[in-house]
């Protein structure tokens, strides 16, 4: 009897699409799904480009290797299961890729991003590659702690309901001594704000070391709380050169009983952020997250990572607040797209909605929500639009719009608080802030000289530029 010869190892190079393009595949509930905007080089078919993305972000490499025979590639490979042309774009495609759950370490955003947005983004066969959206399976989400506390617990801690929270970034962002910094914090909190904030640039520079800042700020918080009978807070930035120093600062903040700390999650990194989020839950600290560096990653349409993905990743990694743009201020943000990722930050379940850039239905499986923070070039005339756009579960941050008041910091804070309370009352009475917002502010000016002065100062300040991030 003659035995058939085994095919054995077949060395060589073959097209990615022969293995990784599987249009008949139906994604499983346990698959992690990703949507990439792919711009192939001229002459590269979209099927080959999509398959290359699936291969290079999972099990593939440029040539067949002998060790492929030592595992079950069909079990572990990524699969490009659908390709759609991008509307109104030439030679650009949405490629949908499914990744098996076993490719990712439990509870690690770092590992997920290392795989999905790793070396493939430098692939020569592609002119551009952007990760537009991602669907985390419930089985993977349940391995994450998520936000230290979430929106509901934060409101209970603050005893503040039925309105957005009000904040302010202390300016100038660099150069103040710790004592003068604490003075500005006190004036803003006494004037009516709920929070003040370290700028993302503030860490521990020669003009103001972190420990001095923490102590003067905490003194300001305690004094303003005693005078106003309201819970107050300041986002103390614990971002540091090393994780050990970051945790040292966080532990000191917990010792002095400050209510909330802050982290720059993209420059600090997801490993550091997840570590900090777990610490904050254990210690009862709220965690404010700044997105410094995000525009380097997400602003270009054809290459990078969309902010909705970065926001989803932050919700898994952990944070109670996250900056999300303003729509109406000085920073980039188109309304529909912004509200799409705001919903992804704070809702339990979000349906697919292509009009808002949401490519997948996302179930967060009871993971706490993240409060969006609107900050950047906003002032009292923007208040009606901000309340109408973001609703109650948000934090509105006025930096220059508080500290730039002609009468000083405390009157600037009072002007913003009066404008907010007037908008909430008008909304609750059934008035439309979209149509009557300016009238609501003008009426409030009659009984608030602080607001009247702010309105006069900023009556002609607008930031009207076309958003780059559009569908």
Swiss-Prot record:
A GO cellular component annotation in the UniProt record: carboxysome
Major location (coarse): other
Site feature Transition state stabilizer, where: 330
Catalytic function, reaction form: 2 (2R)-3-phosphoglycerate + 2 H(+) = D-ribulose 1,5-bisphosphate + CO2 + H2O; D-ribulose 1,5-bisphosphate + O2 = 2-phosphoglycolate + (2R)-3-phosphoglycerate + 2 H(+)
The EC number(s) this enzyme carries: 4.1.1.39
Catalytic-site annotation from UniProt: 171 (proton acceptor), 290 (proton acceptor)
Domain of life: Bacteria
Compartmental location: Carboxysome
Cofactor: binding details: Binds 1 Mg(2+) ion per subunit.
N6-carboxylysine: residues carrying this PTM: 197
Cofactor(s) for this UniProt protein: Mg(2+)
Residues holding Mg(2+): 197, 199-200
GO terms, molecular function: magnesium ion binding; monooxygenase activity; ribulose-bisphosphate carboxylase activity
Pfam families assigned: RuBisCO_large, RuBisCO_large_N
Post-translational modification comment from the UniProt entry: The disulfide bond which can form in the large chain dimeric partners within the hexadecamer appears to be associated with oxidative stress and protein turnover.
Residue positions binding substrate: 119, 169, 173, 291, 323, 375
Subunit structure: Heterohexadecamer of 8 large chains and 8 small chains; disulfide-linked. The disulfide link is formed within the large subunit homodimers.
Entry's family note: Belongs to the RuBisCO large chain family. Type I subfamily.
Additional note from the record: The basic functional RuBisCO is composed of a large chain homodimer in a 'head-to-tail' conformation. In form I RuBisCO this homodimer is arranged in a barrel-like tetramer with the small subunits forming a tetrameric 'cap' on each end of the 'barrel'.
Protein name: Ribulose bisphosphate carboxylase large chain
Naturally occurring in which organism (per UniProt): Microcystis aeruginosa (strain NIES-843 / IAM M-2473)
């Amino acid at each position: 009897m003659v035995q058939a010869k085994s095919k054995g190892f077949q060395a060589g190079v073959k097209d990615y699409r022969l293995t990784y393009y599987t249009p008949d595949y139906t994604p499983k509930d346990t698959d992690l799904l990703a949507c990439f905007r792919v711009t192939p080089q001229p002459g590269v078919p979209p099927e080959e480009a999509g398959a290359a993305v699936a291969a290079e972000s999972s099990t593939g490499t440029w040539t067949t290797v002998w060790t492929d025979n030592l595992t079950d590639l069909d079990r572990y490979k990524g699969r490009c299961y659908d390709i759609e042309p991008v509307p109104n774009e030439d030679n650009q495609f949405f490629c949908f890729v499914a990744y098996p759950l076993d490719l990712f370490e439990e509870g690690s955003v770092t590992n997920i991003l290392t795989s999905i947005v790793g070396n493939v983004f430098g692939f020569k066969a592609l002119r551009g590659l952007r990760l537009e959206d991602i669907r985390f399976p419930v089985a993977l989400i349940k391995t994450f702690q998520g936000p230290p506390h979430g929106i509901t617990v934060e409101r209970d801690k603050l005893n503040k309901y039925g309105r957005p929270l009000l904040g302010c970034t202390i300016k100038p962002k660099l150069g103040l001594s710790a004592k003068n910094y604490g003075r500005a914090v006190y004036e803003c909190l006494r004037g009516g704000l709920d929070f003040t904030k370290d700028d993302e640039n503030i860490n521990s520079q020669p003009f103001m070391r972190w420990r001095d800042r923490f102590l003067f700020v905490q003194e300001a918080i305690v004094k303003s709380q005693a005078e106003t009978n309201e819970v107050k807070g300041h986002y103390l930035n614990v971002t540091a050169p090393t994780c050990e120093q970051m945790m040292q600062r966080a532990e000191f903040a917990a010792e002095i009983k400050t209510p909330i700390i802050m982290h720059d999650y993209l420059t600090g990194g997801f490993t550091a952020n997840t570590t900090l989020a777990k610490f904050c839950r254990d210690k009862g600290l709220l965690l404010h997250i700044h997105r410094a560096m995000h525009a380097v990653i997400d602003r270009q349409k054809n290459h990078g990572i969309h902010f909705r993905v970065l926001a989803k990743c932050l919700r898994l990694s952990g944070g109670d607040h996250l900056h999300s743009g303003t729509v109406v201020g000085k920073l980039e943000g188109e309304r529909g797209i912004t509200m799409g990722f705001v919903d992804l930050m704070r809702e339990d379940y979000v349906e697919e909605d292509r009009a808002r850039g949401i490519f997948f239905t996302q179930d967060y499986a009871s993971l706490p929500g993240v409060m969006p923070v609107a900050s950047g070039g906003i002032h009292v005339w923007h208040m009606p639009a901000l309340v109408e756009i973001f609703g109650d579960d948000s934090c509105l941050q006025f930096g220059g719009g508080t500290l730039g008041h002609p009468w000083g910091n405390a009157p600037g804070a009072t002007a913003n608080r009066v404008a907010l309370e007037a908008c909430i009352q008008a909304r609750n009475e059934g008035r439309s802030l979209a149509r009557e917002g300016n009238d609501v502010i003008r009426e409030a000016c009659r009984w608030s000289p602080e607001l009247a002065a702010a309105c006069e100062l900023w009556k002609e300040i607008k930031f009207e530029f076309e958003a780059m991030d559009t569908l």
